[in-house]
């Protein structure tokens, strides 16, 4: 079993716990991954990483994207979020390789039903998911008739999206969290396998920036903070 890295007042050091908590299932039947019995990990400069994160436009991305191992780690980071009731109210749809082309065909087909749709629009839709090497669809799947409010379940899905952005940034990629029209069109959602209780929290495009990214102004914290 691999070691975990820990940091305390004495500094950053490595610890190799002798036990792993075995995989279990939550009450909704979703299998859980094994996890260390000892988990107290702090990453040096994590705050600097957060403070340097910014989005890059899906329209200005290039390859390469994350490989299989990197993508697995990005998804693993995605699920490290608050989840009231341990419901796992989210799941992933991966669009890679030819899968992006198939998604484009679906979008073009649905768009063809728009009155007087132009050929340029059809080409745009066919190429929409080709803008980045990898696209992760984050699906919010609501658990109904339970104590956990719907709003909290939706917030958890949003936290998944944010973790994916941060993990991508940590690996040197750029990511863009969008929805666009295809996240709300019932025909598109049906074609990609969403159920009536599911919604797209975001399509996250991941790649490398085609141009140098420049930061943008951020809100002054003092202007949006009150003390009660």
What residue ranges belong to the model's regions?
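Small-aliphatic-rich amphipathic alpha-helix that forms the alpha element of a beta-alpha
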Residues: 78, 136, 142-190
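A glycine-rich helix N-cap at a beta->alpha junction
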Residues: 192-216
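Leucine-biased recognition of intrinsically disordered, low-complexity hydrophobic segments
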Residues: 10-12, 19
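Conserved hydrophobic/aromatic beta-strand scaffold that supports enzyme active sites
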Residues: 49, 135-139, 203-205, 225
């Amino acid at each position: 079993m691999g070691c975990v890295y820990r940091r305390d007042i004495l500094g950053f050091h490595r610890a190799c716990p002798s036990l792993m908590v075995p995989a279990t299932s939550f009450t909704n039947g979703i299998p859980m991954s094994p996890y260390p019995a000892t988990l107290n990990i702090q990453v040096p400069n994590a705050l600097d990483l957060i403070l340097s994160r910014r989005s890059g436009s899906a329209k200005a991305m290039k390859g390469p994207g994350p490989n299989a191992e990197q993508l697995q780690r990005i998804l693993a980071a995605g699920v490290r979020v608050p989840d009231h009731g341990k419901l796992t109210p989210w799941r992933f749809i991966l669009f890679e390789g030819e899968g992006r082309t198939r998604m484009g065909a679906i979008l073009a087909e649905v768009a063809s039903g728009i009155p007087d749709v132009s050929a340029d629009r059809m080409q745009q839709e066919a190429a929409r998911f080709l803008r980045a090497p990898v696209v992760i669809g984050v699906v919010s799947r609501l658990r109904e008739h339970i104590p956990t409010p719907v709003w909290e379940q939706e917030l958890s899905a949003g936290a998944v999206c944010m973790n994916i952005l941060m993990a991508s940034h940590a690996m040197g990629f750029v990511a863009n969290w969008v929805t666009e029209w295809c996240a709300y069109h019932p025909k598109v959602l049906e074609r990609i396998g969403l159920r009536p209780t599911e919604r797209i929290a975001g399509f996250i495009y991941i790649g490398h920036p085609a141009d140098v990214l420049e930061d943008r102004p951020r809100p002054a914290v003092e202007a949006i903070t009150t003390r009660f």
